[in-house]
Amino acid sequence: MVSITLKTNRIFRSCLNLATNLKFSITLFIIICIVSAIGTIIPQDKPKEFYMNTYSLKVLGMPLWKIIQLLSLEKIFYSNFYLILLLCLSFSLFFCSLKSQFPYLRTSRIIKLNNNNPPTSPLHESKKIKYNNIASKNDSSCVQLVSQGYKIYTFDKNLDKAGPLLIHLSLILILLGSAIHAFNDFIAQEMIPIYEVSHIQNVISSGRISKIPQTISLKASAFTVEHENEKVVKQFITNLAMLNSKGEVLKQGLVSVNHPLVYKQVYIFQMDWKLFGIRVNYGKNKIYEFPVQKIEANNEQQWSCTIPAKNQSKLILIFKNMSDEFYVYDNNQNFLKIGKINTPQLIRNTYFTVISKISGTGLQIKKDSSINIVYTGFLLLIIGLVINHKGSKKRT
């Protein structure tokens, strides 16, 4: 039993020495940087078909997309390997702080002032004194002279010593926040038609223990577009409400790209929009809904809709962006006229009115439970760097 205990202690000390080794921490940091760079080069969380089409090149007789999936490079920031690296670096910084930074901060800088020629009556008590020639060199440092026999030391209790410790602590918080994000958070995208209620279903990425809120639903009551001019879109804005299972409003507000709706660490951003169809009135309250198809032309978002006309003919309506105007063509793609929403049209003996467009808002829903931890880490990192820089200038 004693030998087993000794071996266990040796193994523990070896692991502790390795964790507090500066070269080990730097090696881990370099590996994390390389892995993160790979994650930025290879698109993350894409459908399988995307990787099959993009990485069809064969390497050593195997398609590259299979190698990517085999090594989990398509979700590298959620892989076990990446999480283990983050945790190892966090533990390394933590134990290094306990072993080196705290004792360094506690003992401060020690300077031996006298070692020879012992005085006739040596001092035996510690005294805090104002020593002008020392204090002038150390600015606001608290200088304490301590006698020990015939030897006199100064303890320079300086705030500059806290810089490296704050940097270590900030890095630990940032890494811890990243690990929590990888385990507990999720990202989803939803395209919600206006006036309809939708649940969070289209999950793009999620952590191992993350839970998708099934009791929360989303309802978009309005969607508008702000323009800088007639052709340039400034931003999209959605009037969005979060509902509980009983249909009661939990939170409501305007959502845009830079102004999310936040509820219990769930952030909802405006991402995109889509046109689903149009409503057409043929008179006498005969209202029909027709789907639209998206087409690309001249770097503009356009939608095409075919509606029936008299004499078994058809009319083609083209909508551009979010404009209230539409272009009318016949079966042979001959341009007929420009119409407007809520304005009656009489074309080829067909009387109709386009009442409204059925649009939808594209939202990105993400849970970010570690954002406060990460922000605190970056704040401490800035403070630590400022203190460390100030201390280095003093010493020079």
From Swiss-Prot:
Q: Which HAMAP family does the record associate with it?
A: CytC_Ccs1
Q: Which GO terms describe its cellular component?
A: chloroplast thylakoid membrane
- Provide this UniProt record's keywords sorted from A to Z: Chloroplast, Cytochrome c-type biogenesis, Membrane, Plastid, Thylakoid, Transmembrane, Transmembrane helix
An annotated GO BP = cytochrome complex assembly
What family does this chain come from, according to its entry?
Belongs to the Ccs1/CcsB family.
Q: Where in the cell is it found?
A: Plastid, Chloroplast thylakoid membrane
Taken from the record, one Pfam family name reads ResB
Q: Which residues cross the membrane?
A: 22-42, 79-99, 162-182
Q: Which gene encodes it?
A: ccs1
| Organism of this sequence | Cyanidium caldarium (Red alga)
Q: What is this protein called?
A: Cytochrome c biogenesis protein Ccs1
Q: How does it sit in the membrane?
A: Multi-pass membrane protein
* Protein's job: Required during biogenesis of c-type cytochromes (cytochrome c6 and cytochrome f) at the step of heme attachment.
Q: Which InterPro entries match?
A: Cyt_c_bgen_Ccs1/CcsB/ResB, ResB-like_domain
